[in-house]
Every structure is written in structure tokens, then in C-alpha cells.
Regions:
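Short glycine/acidic-rich loop motifs that flank beta-strands on beta-rich extracellular proteins
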Residues: 51-56, 80-81, 124-130, 150-154, ...
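Surface-exposed loop/turn segments connecting beta-strands in extracellular beta-rich domains
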Residues: 53-54, 78-79, 110, 118, ...
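Ser/Thr/Gly-rich low-complexity blocks that favor extended beta-strand/coil architectures
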Residues: 122-124, 148, 173-225, 366-403
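Acidic Gly/Asp/Thr-rich repetitive segments characteristic of extracellular carbohydrate-active
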Residues: 11-68, 103-104
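Small/polar beta-strand repeat architecture
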Residues: 210-255, 387-431, 439
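The right-handed parallel beta-helix/beta-solenoid scaffold, focusing on the short coil/turn
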Residues: 5, 42, 53, 65-67, ...
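Extracellular beta-strand-rich solenoid/capping regions of secreted or surface-exposed proteins
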Residues: 36, 51-70, 77-114, 123-142, ...
Length: 579
């Protein structure tokens, strides 16, 4: 409690019966550490090795004397067998919320902490949340690299294609078996037939990657092992094998995330790496002031892998304050590297003049604490996506996991229509993404749906499989809110991305240029090296400015629908010229 004490953990030489106060008498597990209440200036020194329990420190430092947790250089293996397991509702990941999830690092109700590594590699085994922050404040992670010994995505390279068969080389990390003439992927606590979702990667084309649905294994009639990680696959007709390509295999059941940040603030990742993330990457939910600075979301150099994330890399749902992603490498995601949005809840009832019953509509997002008293909400037309009233929450009552009753300070509007929705507008963040590089990406680059200022500057997008930037807003499909009011896309380089490269596509069914969904979007001084002729598509925007850009096409590469206040000027077109 008094602080200033140093504790030592060494799983190879330690003993939990030791005092843990000297390097020569360390503890062997995290159990004694987890039993402490750490204070200002306390430090925990951890040596490499294998752990079977969660690191779960408690206590509080101060801004001047934070708690320090230091990992020495080396390999750390975290196994889920004795880990803390929690039932969690995680945005966009809720296919199985009632099975408790194992957690490797849990920072809960803790303040002012510095976690540092020095060439430190953290390997998790099985489906585990690598790092969770729950009601944490002022925590900085530095110098840690996270990975899996057995990733949740399996890979093989097509070595040769001949008449009636193909020879493939399976990545050594992708353990497998051949059972009853079928190939089965074997993980730590899971197995898969490899037919849920496949992606194909072409290393000779800058790692360009695209989705293939169920993939080629469904067309294989027989499998024959020809070496430790070499398999000959027989077919009557080639189901899509091309020599030199890498095929990636994963399931689509969303039951985990690599990281989870809930009701936390001032969390910083600096000089870290995520070489593989299971599930939805790092999901930040109703948290604020989050920074990712010089973080590599990419396969470990020299590993031979092409995948670093099972789905999104960074997912922000219902956050506020300032989100900063700077100088990050984002390579090898199976979904969007960055997604920022709120959640529309459908109005399903009005039991009293000051009350409304709301429902989570998407099957992968529910059970979340979406409102607290004092939050401001907007009533939104599901057809036009236009807000028509605001109010303030005074009370919240959960009605199971999928419905919530909120009481409001003022009477509800009289003109609510069936299927209209509500957005919590207190929890909307500003976003800055600078000097990042996106590659080996089958989906969009960045999805941005927030009314606070957005700056996308000096990034490189290389051959994204879908639009490099998507600004959406919808109340009928994913129910991801909301409108943008101040977006600057400046100084970026887009190289042969799928088109439209910048796609402003709200899902409003009633379209009126006098009633736009989005406002004030500036696309300035960017370079568009296009594969075709469509750089920008914009729907339902008031105040769209496209100036100073370089387009590698002589056609006008801007398409607008129901927009007003459009300025397209001073752009340079043709043969890759730069403005």
C-alpha cells in the first residue's frame, strides 16, 4: 500500500512460497502479484517462461509515480487452463457471449500503470483475449509483441498445379490432419474443415488479397500427405488453385477478440506489435482517449505468414474523446483495419410519455451498456437517417440482453415512426489517423462514422480489396451509426485500391439533397493511382470539397448522388500526375 516496492516473478526458477522481493527468491506465478494491492512506485519484474494464469494486478499509482510492470526480453507463453474467464458482450463479436472467455492480461479498476517490454514476445495459446482493460485509466503499453503459436487462421501456398491435382505447402504453424480423406485444421482447443471463409493472396502482386467464399477445398476429392507439411490435393476439375498463391482459411463464428477495452480512458499502445490477433482484433467499447503510436499490426517478419488478424484490427464502438492512430503498419487483416462507429438501437415501444423501449438489432452486437444517465440521444428516421429530436437519459433498465428501457428528461417526440432508431451522441469520438500504411487487406481500409472531427492524413493504402475509405451510417443492416460533420482526407496515397476508392455511402432509403446525411467532407491533395476510373463516390453530402488531388485517369473520377455544395477544382488528371 505504501508503494515503492519491487516484486519479482520467474516461472522457471521461482516459488510462490518465496517472499518475491529479490531476484534470487522470485515467485513462479502471478498468483502472489494478483493478491497485492499495488501502490505508487511499485514495480513488478517478470522473467520469460510459461504461465497458466492471468496477470491481473490491482491498485493505483499516481501520474508522477505509476505502477510499473516490466517484462524482460524473451518469450512468454500464456495458456488458458487456469486463466480468469469472463462472460463478455463485445461489439460485433457476440456470437457466443455466454461462454466465458479466457484473458491473459486483465487490467480492471486500475489507474496509472506502465507496462513495458524489451524485445518481449507474448504468445497466447487457444482462444484468449490477449489484453483487457475494464474501467482502467492512464495505462501505457510499450515494447510488447503479441502473437499466437498456432494462429486461428490457417495458410498454405500452392506450389504446383498439374492435371488432376495440386501440390501445396502448408505453413508449419498451421497444424492439420487428414481424416477420412478430408483435410482438417487442428488448433489449440478448436478444429475446422476450412470451408467457412477463404481468402486468396498473391505475393507477386504486393500481397493483394481477396475473399473466395468457401474456397477450393470443397472441390478436392482426395488428400495425400507427401511430406511433413506437404499435401497433394486431387480433383476432377481445378477448383481454383493457382501456383504461387497463398490460401487463407478461417471460421466465421465470432466468439473472441484479441483485445477488449471497456469503460476505460487514456490507454496508450506505443512501439508494440500484434503479429496475430484472434477474433475481432482490439475492440474498444464506450472508452475514451485511446492512442496507438508506432504499432505494427502485421505478421512477424520472416514468419512466412500473410495474415495478422482474424477480422478487424482496431474496432471502436461507442467511444468518445480522442482516438489517435499514428505511424502504424496495418498488413494482413481479414476485415477492416480500422472501424469507428456508434450503434443505432431500434425503437420498439413507448410505455410512457418519457420512456422508450429500444432493441439491439444486429445479432453480433447486444448486451452492451449502451446508455447511462446523463447521455444525450438523438431520434433518427430509419428511412432518411436524419435526426428529428434530442433528449437526455435519466434512467436505464435492461430488459434482458437485447432490449433496454430508457427514461428521458423530456417527453418523447410525437412523430416517431415504426423502425426509427436512437443513437447515443454523447459517445462519439474525434479521430486522427496519420502516417499509417494499409496492405494485404481484403476489405475496406478505414470505416468512419462519427460526428466529431476526423483527420485522415499522409497514409498509404495499397490495393485494398474494397474501398480504402468508407463513410457509411445505417439503420437497417449493421445498425452502425452515425453522420459525419467534419472530415478531412488529406495528403494520402491510394494505390490500385478497389473502387470507388473513397466511398461515402449512407444507407438512407429516402434521398433528398436538401436533407443530407453527411456534411463538410474535404478530400484534398491526395494521390489516386487508380485501377479504373472511380476515385470518389458520394451520396447525400452537403459540402463536399475535392481539390488539389492527382488522379491517374483523364475521366472525371468523382460521382455524386443527392449532394449539394459540391466543389471540384484544381485537381490534376491523367497518367499518374501529381498535383
Amino acid at each position: 500500500v505504501n508503494g515503492g516496492t519491487v516484486y519479482f516473478v520467474d516461472p522457471r526458477t521461482g516459488d510462490d512460497a518465496n517472499a518475491g522481493l529479490t531476484p534470487g527468491k522470485p515467485w513462479c506465478s502471478f498468483r502472489p502479484v494478483n493478491a497485492l494491492r499495488l501502490g505508487p512506485g511499485d514495480r513488478v519484474e517478470i522473467r520469460p517462461g510459461t504461465f497458466h494464469e492471468t496477470l491481473m494486478p490491482m491498485g493505483a499509482g499516481t501520474a508522477g509515480k505509476p505502477i510499473e510492470i516490466r517484462f524482460a526480453s524473451g518469450d512468454y507463453d500464456f495458456h488458458p487452463d487456469n486463466a480468469v474467464r469472463l462472460k463478455l458482450h463485445i461489439s460485433n463479436s457476440n456470437d457466443d457471449p455466454y461462454t466465458p472467455k479466457a484473458v491473459a492480461f486483465l487490467f480492471q479498476d486500475i489507474r496509472h500503470v506502465r507496462i513495458t517490454g524489451n524485445r518481449t514476445d507474448i504468445y497466447v495459446h487457444g482462444k484468449m483475449i490477449q489484453t483487457m482493460f475494464d474501467h482502467a485509466e492512464d495505462v501505457v503499453l510499450t515494447g510488447l509483441a503479441f502473437d499466437y503459436r498456432r494462429p486461428l487462421v490457417s495458410e498454405f501456398t500452392v506450389v504446383k498445379v498439374a492435371e488432376g491435382h495440386a501440390d501445396v505447402r502448408i505453413h508449419p504453424d498451421s497444424t492439420y490432419a487428414i481424416e477420412n480423406d478430408r483435410l482438417v485444421w487442428l488448433g489449440e482447443g478448436w478444429r475446422s474443415a476450412g470451408t467457412d471463409l477463404n481468402q486468396e493472396c498473391d505475393p507477386s502482386d504486393d500481397g493483394r488479397v481477396w475473399r473466395r467464399g468457401s474456397g477450393p477445398l470443397t472441390g478436392v476429392t482426395r488428400f495425400e500427405r507427401t511430406g511433413p507439411f506437404e499435401v497433394r490435393m486431387f480433383f476432377d476439375q481445378n477448383p481454383g488453385f493457382t501456383a504461387g498463391r497463398v490460401i487463407q482459411f478461417r471460421e466465421t463464428f465470432r466468439d473472441c477478440a484479441a483485445g477488449f477495452v471497456r469503460r476505460s480512458r487514456n490507454i496508450v499502445w506505443r512501439d508494440c506489435a500484434y503479429h496475430f490477433m484472434g477474433g475481432m482484433g482490439i475492440v474498444s467499447q464506450f472508452s475514451e482517449d485511446l492512442t496507438f503510436d508506432h504499432v505494427a499490426f502485421a505478421p512477424r517478419p520472416g514468419s512466412g505468414r500473410t495474415t495478422s488478424s482474424w477480422a478487424d484490427m482496431l474496432h471502436f464502438s461507442g467511444c468518445r474523446g480522442r482516438i489517435v492512430v499514428a505511424d502504424c503498419e496495418m498488413s494482413g487483416s481479414h476485415d477492416d483495419p480500422i472501424n469507428v462507429h456508434g450503434t443505432h438501437l431500434r425503437i420498439t415501444g413507448q410505455p410512457a410519455s418519457h420512456q422508450i423501449l429500444l432493441r439491439f438489432m444486429h445479432g453480433q452486437t447486444y448486451g452492451i451498456e449502451a446508455f447511462v444517465p446523463g447521455d444525450e440521444v438523438e431520434f433518427v428516421s430509419h428511412l432518411s437517417l436524419r435526426a428529428y429530436a434530442t433528449n437526455v437519459v435519466t434512467a436505464v433498465e435492461a430488459k434482458g440482453d437485447k432490449e433496454v428501457l430508457i427514461t428521458l428528461a423530456s417527453p418523447c417526440p410525437a412523430d416517431i415512426e415504426a423502425n426509427d432508431v436512437v443513437e447515443n451522441i454523447t459517445w462519439t469520438p474525434s479521430v486522427e489517423v496519420r502516417n499509417c500504411r494499409v496492405s494485404v487487406d481484403s476489405c475496406r481500409g478505414f470505416l468512419l462514422s462519427t460526428r466529431q472531427p476526423v483527420l485522415i492524413e499522409n497514409n498509404v493504402f495499397l490495393k485494398t480489396g474494397m474501398s480504402a475509405i468508407l463513410i457509411a451510417d445505417d439503420a437497417n443492416s449493421w445498425f452502425e451509426s452515425g453522420p459525419v460533420r467534419d472530415v478531412m482526407i488529406r495528403g494520402n496515397t491510394f494505390i490500385k485500391c478497389s473502387e470507388p476508392v473513397v466511398n461515402i455511402a449512407p444507407e438512407n432509403h429516402t434521398v433528398n439533397p436538401d436533407a443530407p446525411v453527411h456534411r463538410n467532407i474535404r478530400i484534398m491533395n491526395n494521390t489516386f493511382d487508380l485501377a479504373g476510373d472511380m476515385a470518389i463516390s458520394a451520396k447525400s453530402v452537403h459540402g463536399l470539397t475535392v481539390t488539389g488531388n492527382g488522379f491517374s485517369t483523364r475521366k472525371l473520377p468523382v460521382h455524386t448522388v443527392a449532394c449539394a455544395g459540391v466543389v471540384i477544382a484544381d485537381n490534376v488528371q491523367g497518367d499518374g500526375q501529381h498535383p
